[in-house]
Amino acid sequence: MIRKRFLAGLVTASAALLAVCGPSRAVADLDDPRGHASRANDLTVSMDYDKARAELAKADPNSPAVILAKARLALYEEDCDLTAALLSRADVGQQDEGRLLADVGRGCARVTAATIVDKDDVNGIVIRYQDGADRTLTPLLVDTVLKARTSLTRDLGVEWKRPTRITVVRDLLSLSAMTGLPYKAAQTTGTVAVAKWGRVTLLSPRASHHGYPFRDTLAHELTHLAISMQTRDRAPLWLHEGVARREEVRWREPGIFDERPSVESIVARGIELKLDLALDKLGPSIAMLPSADAATVAFAEVTSFIKYFAETSPADALPRLLVALRTAKTADDALKEVSGETLSQWDVRWRANLAKHPKEPLSPMFGLGAMPPGLGDSRERSRLAELLVGRGHHAEALTELEKIPAEMLADPSLRYLRARVLEGTDSAKQAEALLDDPKLWTASYGPCWAVRGRLARARGDQPAAEVSFGEALAHDPFGIESACQVLPSAPNPPLDRLGQGAPLCETARKRADPDLGRE
């Protein structure tokens, strides 16, 4: 059993790397008296690339500010080699902004040197894969982009510029190189995606054991791109992250885990642990906070605040706020223009509302604070049970699992293990009862959904099976149980039963992850 911060241990870093990645207006003002570079930067972050190019054509080509603007535009259009070449000039490349752009340009060039590109010209989507084994994700990624763009247009008034660019990378080093997010920060907070430079860079689900909710993560990051376009990259971090967390689930039907645990309960626990921060003191990125616990609490704070703002304001308040940020001197000015109150005034109202929420228990399995009692012993017993399963001793494995306290079954990885053991002892009914109510799980978990789907199909409940396998694929698309809908030791089902999932099954088989206890 692995103690996992299921809700926010995998942090989606964002375009809100504001302090280190935004264009420097001070430099532009010094050697760009006509403002061509500044206007081009605004057009670039708004993804109006043709207009940005036209603006730069009017400018002095030797101006450092203009060269920086051209390098930025090239990076947004994925011409990483051109970015690096433009910044080879010493007086440009040695500026702070120039060094950052040059580093990202070189990193991007290395990562994308041998990538495979899938283009959907009809829908305006370009997906670049560092590893060809991830290409079978394309149908799921395209479907997510289309639905997320529609929901973001509905909620935020976004007019999407095409194409929407996505790069899928194989590891955190590549994620860091492509985006400028420090590798150490990505490791500390468990970052799996970054929206910056006009694209979403997404870590392959293959990089994480049993994947992660990559479809919601993609919707989250697309929200950051939408906010950057609408505000010309002038949105504060609390707005970026709060709106992205709100929107990451609005592209699909509501799910069982969308409000579990409630963000208010996480904030309350964070306050007890002194992990909370003022909304305007979050730093340049949540992905750069000192720990995953701190990131969890920060995400909960901004999510709760934006939820309160949206629910107590007119329906068009968020779209109007994004537009107001384009020209307002500060975020406070924009907020006051739209709502009549500043952030500090809203903060007082939000915290007063927060205090009215009844105290909710937060499962110790969630990950904030002290480790639950008995965790070490439970981990050892679960590992022993896995090894016994791998050698065909299911009854003995069940004996070990029965010694683990029942409250530990909130951990879905342990619940999955017990369900697999029950399957192996011909106790399908007990396994069904164990997985029947996902509300008993701490968080959504692909393998649990896969077993649930398999059991539902065996008893003839096809609708429940389809829902369960859909959830399994959304989290663990390269797991054999999710993609092939069978045990790893079983032959593949008929391909027509898998439908569009057949290529994922083939990829999962080629990956050949060992089954329980066979590592």
Residue map of PLM features:
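N-terminal secretory signal peptides that target proteins for export/translocation
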Residues: 1-4
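Bacterial N-terminal signal peptides
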Residues: 9-19
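Bacterial Sec-dependent signal peptides at the C-terminal "C-region" and cleavage site
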Residues: 17-31
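Beta/coil-rich, acidic/histidine-enriched accessory regions frequently appended to metallopeptidases
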Residues: 27-59, 82-89, 293-297, 323-519
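Extracytoplasmic/secreted proteins, especially bacterial periplasmic and envelope-associated proteins
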Residues: 35, 39, 51, 82-85, ...
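Sec-exported extracytoplasmic/periplasmic mature domains
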Residues: 45, 57, 61, 75-78, ...
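Long amphipathic alpha-helical scaffold segments
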Residues: 76-126
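Juxtacatalytic substrate-recognition/specificity segment
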Residues: 114-237, 247-254, 267-276, 280, ...
